[in-house]
Structures are given as structure tokens and as C-alpha cells.
């Protein structure tokens, strides 16, 4: 855990606001969504929100260099949000290592791309959202279910949380 996180944005539609954004951060170790944020405007500030959530949840603060000595890499694509000075400065401030996906190589960020495909199929293709508030609630419910109940072949048929907890128990027994 805490070696590589992926992040990306995904657009979806609401009747009231039109196109909106979901930004997510995923843990490559177990596919757990560590942070997510919905917004009408998909700018660098919206893209930073789930990164901050993930850092605060896992390391307890947003202090300067809070993850510097961990060796944690953040892998975004080359979207303008991620290439912006504000985004770059914030991840440097937090101590995250920047590891961008290769240009025109979505498989480089395949973990988050796969999650976005899943949420597209399970949420965005099924629901017609009235507004961003309704979308945020339904997306949040799905992410909660995904983290705790979504069975993934790659994780030996466990959910992301179950895999993390099972791995921590195994590591403690070995130690």
C-alpha cells in the first residue's frame, strides 16, 4: 500500500447542470477509491480535492512534506488539470512523487481507467441525474459499495477493503 496512487477525471451528465465531473484517486495495491470529488467545473482545484482527501485519510494531515519519506507516487494522465502549476505545486508541497502516464497510453493508468469504466456501466449508464447533488449521493453510495463489496478477480475474489484488511493481517502474522 501507499506506493502508487492513480488519479483521473470522468465526465457525466445531469439535467440541471449539464456536463459535470467526477475526480477519483485509487490505490494501485487494492483498487480502493481513497478520495473522490464531483464538480460542475473540472479544473485543477476540483482535481486536487480527492488527492487531498486521500492524503488526509491515510496520513492524518495536509502538512508540508507529509508523505515525502513514504515514496508514494501519484499517476495522473496529461490532462490540463494535472499539468497545471497549481496541481504540480500542491503535490510537491505534500511530498508526493509525480509519475505521469505516458502520452496516448491509457493502459499506464489502467487501474483508475478500469474503475471509471465500472462506474460508467454501473451508475452513469443507468441513472438519469436531476442535478449534481443527486449525482453526488448516488456516486458516493456506489463508491462505498465498490470499496466494501465489489469482488475483483485481481484481488483473489475479494473487495478492495477486504483485500487490504486480509493483507494487513497476513503481514502481521509474518512479522
Regions found by a protein language model. Give the residues of each.
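Mobile-element integrase/transposase regions
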Residues: 1-26, 32, 48-53, 57-64, ...
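Acidic active-site catalytic centers that drive phospho-/nucleotidyl reactions
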Residues: 8, 27, 77, 109, ...
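Hydrophobic (often cysteine-bearing) scaffold residues that line and stabilize catalytic clefts
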Residues: 22, 43, 47, 75, ...
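A short acidic/small-residue loop/turn micro-motif
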Residues: 27-28, 38-45
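Short small-residue beta-strand/loop micro-motif enriched in glycine and branched aliphatics
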Residues: 32-36, 98-101, 125-126
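Acidic/histidine-rich, metal-coordinating catalytic segments
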Residues: 51, 63-84, 102, 158-161
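RNase H-like polynucleotidyl transferase catalytic core
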Residues: 73-78, 92-111, 128-132
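C-terminal domain-tail junction helix/linker
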Residues: 85, 92-96, 118-175
